[in-house]
UniProtKB/Swiss-Prot annotation:
<dbReference type="GO" id="GO:0005615">
    <property type="term" value="C:extracellular space"/>
</dbReference>
<dbReference type="Pfam" id="PF00711">
    <property type="entry name" value="Defensin_beta"/>
</dbReference>
<dbReference type="InterPro" id="IPR006080">
    <property type="entry name" value="Beta/alpha-defensin_C"/>
</dbReference>
<dbReference type="GO" id="GO:0031731">
    <property type="term" value="F:CCR6 chemokine receptor binding"/>
</dbReference>
<feature type="disulfide bond">
    <location>
        <begin position="27"/>
        <end position="56"/>
    </location>
</feature>
<protein>
    <recommendedName>
        <fullName>Beta-defensin 11</fullName>
    </recommendedName>
</protein>
<feature type="disulfide bond">
    <location>
        <begin position="34"/>
        <end position="49"/>
    </location>
</feature>
<dbReference type="InterPro" id="IPR001855">
    <property type="entry name" value="Defensin_beta-like"/>
</dbReference>
<dbReference type="GO" id="GO:0042742">
    <property type="term" value="P:defense response to bacterium"/>
</dbReference>
<keyword id="KW-0044">Antibiotic</keyword>
<feature type="disulfide bond">
    <location>
        <begin position="39"/>
        <end position="57"/>
    </location>
</feature>
<dbReference type="GO" id="GO:0042056">
    <property type="term" value="F:chemoattractant activity"/>
</dbReference>
<comment type="similarity">
    <text>Belongs to the beta-defensin family.</text>
</comment>
<keyword id="KW-0929">Antimicrobial</keyword>
<feature type="signal peptide">
    <location>
        <begin position="1"/>
        <end position="22"/>
    </location>
</feature>
<keyword id="KW-0964">Secreted</keyword>
<comment type="function">
    <text>Has bactericidal activity. Active against E.coli ML35 and S.aureus 502A.</text>
</comment>
Length: 60
């Protein structure tokens, strides 16, 4: 029965990891860069890198 709880927790962890860009590695994997200010000119925000203040920006 403990194995079921472990597998369920692992499933939730995997599903929550794919719910958006939340780190610099996943930002780079999606073709973006981490910028601590507003995304400049031709770039648009596709997520965050280190929480709310740092944006993950990508060119159109």
């Amino acid at each position: 029965m403990r194995l079921h709880h472990l597998l369920l927790a692992l499933l939730f962890l995997v599903l929550s990891a794919g719910s958006g860009i939340s780190g610099p590695l996943s930002c780079r994997r999606n073709g973006g860069v981490c910028i601590p200010i507003r995304c400049p000119g031709p770039m648009r925000q596709i997520g965050t890198c280190f929480g709310r203040p740092v944006k993950c920006c990508r060119s159109w």
